[in-house]
Amino acid sequence: MPKNYTPAAAATGTWTEEEIRHQPRAWIRSLTNIDALRSALNNFLEPLLRKENLRIILTGAGTSAFIGDIIAPWLASHTGKNFSAVPTTDLVTNPMDYLNPAHPLLLISFGRSGNSPESVAAVELANQFVPECYHLPITCNEAGALYQNAINSDNAFALLM
């Protein structure tokens, strides 16, 4: 969060203005981070994307769920892969509606803090129900549970924005 956040700033729109002004720096930093990790990211993703029945779920809590809603159709049409967007609240309340143990799964989790209880629970449920489950959390918080769990796991790769 920007250092000048206060409830008063949020109420007056200063918070929103700061978030908007922060975007160019944030995108450049994110692209630099991804560029530095490109080889390792490709090494993680390439074998997964070759799996015939791979299911890819884009998920997040609240506004982070909208990311998946926006990009899943484009990714599916441009890659021919099985992408779907499922909010973490849906995954947590009805996991068997979305998690098929017969197919490998790549769960791409979006979360600014990486600490929302439903995001962490979605990862745990995916691991519990899908024997061949992989994770790609994309978060802004290296201290968050999504990031920390991924960097300490053999079946995950984490991206820090």
Region roles according to the model:
Residues 1-51, 158-161:
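Cofactor-/ligand-binding subdomain signature composed of acidic, glycine-rich
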Residues 49-161:
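Glycine-rich phosphate-binding loops that contact phosphosugars or nucleotide phosphates
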